[in-house]
Amino acid sequence: LRGLLDKIHAFLDANPTETVIVSIKREGIGNATDQHLSKILKTHYATDRDRWFTDNRIPTLGEARNKVVLIRRFAIDESLEKENDGAGWAIDAESWPDNCADGICSSGEIRVQDFYEVTATHNISKKITFAAEQLARSAKTVCDLSKDQTAADVEAAKFPVFVNFLSASNFWRANCWPDKIAAKVNPSIIDHLCRKHNEPSTGKPTGDGSTGIVVCDWVGHEGDWDLVRCIVGMNAKLETR
């Protein structure tokens, strides 16, 4: 973890207007608990408030620039529940929906598509459909950019962060390994973004057209970055408002 964070910090030093979202969960056997993990992260890693955003809420991009934004998929120690004026420590995604087509964390902060158990090749089409549906849900959101909003207005208009996983696998079927799935999912999502994204049958966009966070697999393979270009391009349209 230390080596990974060193690379993240180096990236942020070189690109101070960017942000990096880090999602962490505890896995594996042993006697360690979520609470142990939370204390280790707080004490030894997420120590610099100028570099880490660890409030239990979704930040604005301005707040997040040049910082690591921590999403925790684990419970926290009782001592950390008092952090941030009693709101808790880090963005709460403890109740992360498992293997879901459309799920919302109990905190309401994150809406996720993470259907990953592709048991056979015919299920890859289901994965593509679920990913496209999540893109459509994200596209419908509208960000209020009026400058005279109060904090209460911002909170009332808040919507969850959309997280959309394109990755999936089945270890026991070689034709459902991550690279094979990506070879079908990625071109399909590129096609969706180019021809259908935020374009309903009426021809009028329904929202801002943002894609949300799209977690990709095998991007840049053999120099093909079209998927990333499409995602960045769709989100960049917000700059024209």
Regions found by a protein language model. Name each.
Residues 1-241:
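Catalytic cores of phosphodiester-bond hydrolases, prominently lipid phosphodiesterases
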